[in-house]
Structures are given as C-alpha cells and as structure tokens.
A protein has these predicted regions:
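Compact beta-sheet-dominated domain cores in extracellular/mature segments
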Residues: 5, 14-103
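Classical eukaryotic N-terminal signal peptides for Sec-dependent ER targeting/secretion
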Residues: 1-9
Length: 103
C-alpha cells in the first residue's frame, strides 16, 4: 500500500463531522452532516416536515466548528423560522421546514 493511501485511510478514519438531526412530529427524521458550512440545502419530503425537534452537534476535526444552524419555511432558505447553536432543541409549536443552513 502506498504511504499516501495509508495516510488518507488514517485521516478518513479519524475525521468527524458536524451533525444536524431534524425530527418531525410524525416520526420522520432527516440526518445531515458535513465538515464545512453547508450552504443552503432543501429538504425534499412530501408532505413537508412539521419539525418539533432539532439536535445539532457541531464538532469537527481539522476544520473550524460551525456555530449555528437555521431552519427555513421555504425552499431556497427564505423565510427564517428557527436559529440556534449546539444542543438538542424542542420547537414549540412545531413548524413546517423546507430548507436549512449550517454555518
């Protein structure tokens, strides 16, 4: 095995990513993850998710940890509905969410 391949495997095995789990009141869940800012991401569920909980774990290796996640009413990240940081959050009342950002 080439040293560069071995190094890649070692780094891949130890790299962690931020994680955002979005829970809907009907039991559906969206799990997302990454190592850098997400940019705007649409959530493609029909019917739309009625979100009542979000769990954000921002820890990453090798990259600065993101501080914030945002949930939006509309696709394309318009109509900000909720913003928070690290933790497990209850959204009361539940709200319809169609997109998100992590940064």
């Amino acid at each position: 095995m080439k040293p560069s391949t071995l190094l890649s495997l070692l780094v891949a095995g130890t790299t962690t990513a931020w994680k955002l789990d979005i829970h809907a009141s009907d039991g559906r869940k969206v799990s997302t993850h990454g190592t850098r800012d997400s940019g705007c991401k649409n959530i493609e569920f029909t019917p739309v998710l009625n979100v009542n909980r979000a769990n954000f774990k921002p820890a990453t290796d090798l990259y600065p940890d993101p501080k914030t996640f945002e949930l939006y009413v509309n696709k394309g990240c318009s109509g900000l509905s909720y913003r928070n940081g690290k933790g497990d959050w209850r959204l009361t009342p539940a709200r319809k969410i169609r997109s998100y950002k992590v940064y």
